[in-house]
């Protein structure tokens, strides 16, 4: 069976097989009248628009100012260097959050005091531009489709900003200084009656990013529907890979099946590059070459998720390529599955994600000790020495939303600072502190979970030759605890990672990921295996009989 045959069979199979929930968690929160994850059909209300105004008001709440103007430019159009061809368009996510507009060369302003959201668009195009690229949407079309108080062309924006800076109260809030327009007065003189008082810049870049990060961390009902849609299509892509896996010969075919499934479902953009690492390639966390043969390798680590209307999904599954685990691979998979199951059960509002990450390390260490991969001390000694980080070197998870590694409350998207700590507590060893400082997955604002956040839980155990032999085994602090001889048996495992997207609900969590895993995934991989083996035996029997007949005829 070749890849073309596998792909052609998926359409028929999609109609016959549901994408089933993969682990605990209620479906009760899903608005099934508007979105049915099993059919992967999103059914918007007739008058539904992207909730741009709601999102703008959320930002206003966290900006905590009574007046001012939010100014956000969308992505401008541009071509590759030394080329007349543009890259694939990817809208600036902060702009998209308060607009829902996926068009280039637009700007949005939000008057905080007046509660007015305005979109500024390029003038209508004509001539060759329309012939080649189609007509840009008109003001009337945009007003009917999007949630704005007013839409105006960019030709009037400079005048509007100058008017605002001289007559309206409050600063013009921008994300970054370089995004402030350069063609209006940067220094203005405010007047009090007839007297000039102070000369100052109208722009302020100190508050908006933090406010928008905090707003974006809590998903609106519309955003959750988009993430569900992306998750459902992602599930179908993973399912199709499982169906064909035993008949594939190269990592490239795995990537092709996944992306083709997403595109066929109208999800034409991946939230990140597909990671289809087989064998020892699975030990490279962000392996994306996807070009090596599968033959003779134990596991496939497939980390892949599509976008739907700019909202991401992020799912990882690790499965045996042959449909059967080796003893070593199954042992590692069971540890990682236990890490994930226990950590997911700890999710709820008020839970500290940092503590859940620490729990994952404890489960990993216990499993590695049971296998004899780490030894030479008590559990507490090995834990405080940070030995588990040699095998589990990344954070447990991250926010998911408009970015696959989405922003969180307070600070920037990814930080190297430890959540909730400005410095290492005095009684922590450097190695133990490293376990925690690797949790750079939420923001400086802390790691406390809140209702309507979406986070991943993605524990993993890896046998990276480079990490182990060039880093940890060269450090006496780690090497004395690692069983170097036993490592040789586990290098071919490569790595195991399991990742789901979880919605924090009022009293716990809901697993948004419906991709099969564990024994259910093995059933899909091995579907038809017995029949194929019987057909192969029958073909061999007939070939043997044919050879015998020819031999008899010859004599």
UniProtKB/Swiss-Prot annotation:
**E.C. designation(s):** 3.4.11.9
Task: Please share the entry's free-text remark on the cofactor.
Answer: Binds 2 manganese ions per subunit.
What are its GO biological-process terms? proteolysis
The record's listing under PROSITE patterns reads:
PROLINE_PEPTIDASE
Basic and acidic residues bias: start-end ranges: 538-547
Record keywords:
Aminopeptidase, Hydrolase, Manganese, Metal-binding, Metalloprotease, Protease
Can you state which reaction this protein catalyses? Release of any N-terminal amino acid, including proline, that is linked to proline, even from a dipeptide or tripeptide
Map out region (Disordered) in residue numbers: 527-555
Q: Name one Pfam family in it.
A: AMP_N
**Which SUPFAM superfamilies does the record match to this protein?**
Creatinase/aminopeptidase (SSF55920), Creatinase/prolidase N-terminal domain (SSF53092)
Q: Could you tell me one molecular function GO term of this UniProt entry?
A: manganese ion binding
InterPro entries associated with the record: Aminopep_P_N, Creatin/AminoP/Spt16_N, Creatinase/aminopeptidase-like, Pept_M24, Peptidase_M24B_aminopep-P_CS, X-Pro_dipept-like
* Binding positions for Mn(2+) 1 per the UniProt entry: 314, 458, 499
The entry's family comment says: Belongs to the peptidase M24B family.
Which PANTHER family does the record match to this protein? XAA-PRO AMINOPEPTIDASE 3, XAA-PRO AMINOPEPTIDASE AN0832-RELATED
Q: What does this protein do?
A: Catalyzes the removal of a penultimate prolyl residue from the N-termini of peptides.
Q: What is this protein called?
A: Probable Xaa-Pro aminopeptidase BC1G_13431
Q: Which organism is it from?
A: Botryotinia fuckeliana (strain B05.10) (Noble rot fungus)
């Amino acid at each position: 069976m070749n890849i073309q045959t596998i792909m052609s069979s998926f359409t028929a199979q999609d109609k016959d097989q549901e994408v089933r929930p993969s682990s605990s968690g209620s479906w009760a929160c899903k608005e099934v009248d508007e979105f049915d994850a099993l059919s992967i059909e999103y059914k918007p209300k007739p008058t539904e628009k992207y909730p741009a105004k709601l999102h703008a008001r959320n930002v206003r709440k966290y900006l905590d100012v009574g007046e001012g103007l939010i100014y956000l430019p969308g992505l401008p159009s541009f071509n590759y260097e030394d080329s007349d061809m543009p890259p694939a368009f990817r809208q600036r996510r902060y702009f998209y959050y308060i607009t829902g507009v996926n068009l280039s060369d637009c700007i949005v302003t939000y008057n905080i005091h007046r509660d007015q959201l305005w979109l500024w668009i390029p003038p209508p195009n004509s001539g060759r531009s329309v012939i080649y690229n189609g007509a840009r949407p008109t003001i009337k079309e945009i007003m009917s489709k999007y949630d704005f108080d007013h839409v105006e062309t960019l030709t009037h924006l400079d005048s509007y900003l100058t008017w605002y800076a001289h007559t309206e109260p409050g600063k013009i809030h921008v994300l970054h200084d370089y995004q402030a327009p350069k063609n209006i007065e940067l220094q203005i003189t405010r007047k009090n009656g007839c007297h000039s008082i102070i000369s100052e810049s109208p722009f302020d870049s100190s508050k908006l990013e933090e406010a928008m990060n905090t707003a974006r961390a809590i998903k609106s009902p519309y955003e959750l529907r988009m993430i569900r849609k992306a998750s459902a299509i992602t599930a179908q892509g993973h399912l199709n890979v499982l169906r064909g896996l035993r008949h594939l010969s190269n990592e490239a075919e795995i990537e092709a099946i996944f992306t083709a499934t997403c595109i066929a479902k109208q999800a034409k953009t991946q939230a990140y590059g597909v990671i289809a690492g087989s064998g020892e390639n699975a030990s490279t966390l962000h392996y994306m070459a996807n070009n090596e043969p599968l033959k003779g390798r134990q596991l496939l680590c497939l980390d892949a998720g599509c976008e739907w209307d700019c909202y991401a999904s992020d799912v990882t599954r690790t499965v045996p390529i042959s449909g059967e685990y080796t003893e070593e691979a199954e042992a590692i998979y069971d540890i990682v599955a236990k890490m994930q199951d226990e950590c997911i059960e700890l999710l709820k509002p008020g839970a500290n994600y940092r503590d859940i990450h620490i729990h994952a390390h404890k489960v990993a260490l216990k499993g590695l000790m049971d296998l004899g991969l780490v030894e030479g001390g008590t559990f507490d000694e090995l834990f405080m020495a940070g030995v588990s980080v040699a095998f589990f070197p990344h954070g447990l998870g991250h926010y998911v939303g408009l970015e696959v590694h989405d922003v969180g409350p307070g600070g920037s998207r990814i930080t190297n600072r430890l959540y909730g700590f400005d410095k290492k507590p005095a009684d922590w060893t450097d190695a133990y502190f490293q376990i925690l400082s690797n949790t750079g997955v939420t923001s400086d604002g802390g790691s406390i979970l809140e209702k309507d956040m979406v986070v991943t839980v993605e524990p993993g155990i890896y046998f990276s030759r480079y990490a182990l032999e060039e880093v940890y085994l060269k450090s006496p602090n780690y090497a004395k605890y690692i069983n170097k001889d036993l490592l040789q048996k586990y290098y071919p495992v490569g790595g195991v990672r399991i990742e789901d997207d979880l919605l924090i609900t009022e009293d716990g969590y809901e697993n948004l990921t419906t991709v099969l895993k564990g024994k259910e995934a093995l059933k899909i991989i091995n579907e038809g295996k017995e029949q194929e083996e019987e057909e192969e035996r029958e073909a061999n029997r007939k070939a043997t009989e044919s050879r015998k007949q020819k031999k008899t005829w010859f004599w």
